[in-house]
Regions:
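Conserved catalytic alpha/beta core of Sir2/sirtuin-type deacylases, generalized to analogous enzyme cores
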Residues: 86, 166, 182-186
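Glycine/serine-rich phosphate-binding loop and adjoining beta1-alpha1 elements at the start
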Residues: 1-45
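Rossmann-fold NAD(P)-binding glycine/threonine-rich loop
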Residues: 8-24, 124-181
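Generic secondary-structure signature for well-ordered alpha-helical cores
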Residues: 1, 16-21, 44-48, 73, ...
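Glycine-rich phosphate/diphosphate-binding loop of Rossmann-like nucleotide-binding domains
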Residues: 33-126, 131, 135-136, 140-145
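Short alpha-helical "patches" and their helix-cap loops
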Residues: 52-59, 178-186
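Short capping/connector residues at structural and topological boundaries
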Residues: 30, 55, 164-167
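General beta-strand structural signal in soluble alpha/beta enzymes
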Residues: 1, 24-27, 32, 50, ...
């Protein structure tokens, strides 16, 4: 079920059979979760080889954080996974230059600052939150998006577009099968 739902609907009370769970939200779904899959496709599209890289994954939700960590491990990454309160571990990992990639999906404005990105190659901002005026922000501070020495996904028009593209991909896989889709898109 696409979240968020209206407050009067409890997502736990809605049943989607695994065979049609194209969002990949259920752990037994045959489909990969759309947002983590979209993040992995971003790495593919920029030609960034994750093999052996040190990745800091911020956020441990069932929909994004945990499936993303699993996908990163399958790509032979060394993953440090923290939640939004994992500041000490995050600090030491980032400031000791141990991290090649930062992926933040905590939904907290300014969670990642330019000072956090010392020696980082790529920063993927998955988080979404809104200020008191309703303006959308990511997890990265505004100054991060202006950094020239690393690749940073845009806060608008970045991971969200990839999530929707992967949802469409999963729908096509449901209809035609994964082998046919691989033939079509390569």
């Amino acid at each position: 079920v696409q979240l968020p739902l209206p407050k009067h609907i409890n997502p736990q009370n809605i049943y989607i059979p695994d065979a049609v769970d194209v969002d990949g939200f259920n752990s037994t779904s045959p489909f990969q979760p759309c947002t983590p899959l979209g993040v992995m496709k971003i790495f593919d599209s920029i030609g960034y080889d994750l093999d052996g890289k040190n990745v800091l994954a911020c956020g441990q939700s069932d929909i994004v954080g945990r499936p993303l960590v699993d996908m990163l491990i399958k790509r032979h990454c060394n993953v440090i996974s923290v939640n939004s309160s994992g500041n000490a571990l995050r600090y030491y990992a980032l400031h000791d230059g141990l991290v090649d990639v930062v992926i933040s999906a905590v939904g907290e404005r300014d969670f990642i600052s330019p000072l956090d990105l010392f020696n980082v190659d790529v920063c993927i901002d998955v988080g979404i939150n809104y200020d008191e005026n309703g303006k959308q922000h990511g997890d990265c501070a505004d100054a991060v998006y202006n950094m020239k020495d690393i690749k940073v996904t845009p806060r608008i028009g970045g991971v969200g577009l990839m999530t929707r593209a992967m949802l469409l991909y999963n729908v096509c896989v449901a209809k035609y099968g994964e082998h046919k889709m691989e033939e079509v898109i390569g």
